[in-house]
Amino acid sequence: YTNSGNPVGAAAALAALDETNKLNLASNAKARGAELNLGLNKLKSKHRIIGDVRGKGLMAAVELVEDPETKKPASKDVVSKIYKTICDEGVLVRASGNNFIISPSLIITKDHVNKIVTAIDKGFSII
């Protein structure tokens, strides 16, 4: 392949790995991911529209439902309104059907996690 074994690409990869290790990003992702999942699960007990919260590390999904018993998916209109409110708060999530996918950067701070959870809470509060 054209760039296989290219020394410039290899040097860039090694530098990226060095920076990842220097910043201890794996440990940060584990700690912030635990905070994110805790915050999202607290929102689940507050908002009936949250049918489920799933996550591992810094990747999480929030399922939106009309009824928590039947798990009927929330309508596109409701998802869109919540999504717009979250974005207006300065937080980007990915809407995928009736799910919000949250996958922040590995360098996220505790304050950023709080901002994400607060923005999502505001989004759900409009319903």
Per-region residue spans from a language model:
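Conserved N-terminal phosphate-binding loop of PLP-dependent enzymes in the Aspartate aminotransferase
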Residues: 1-127
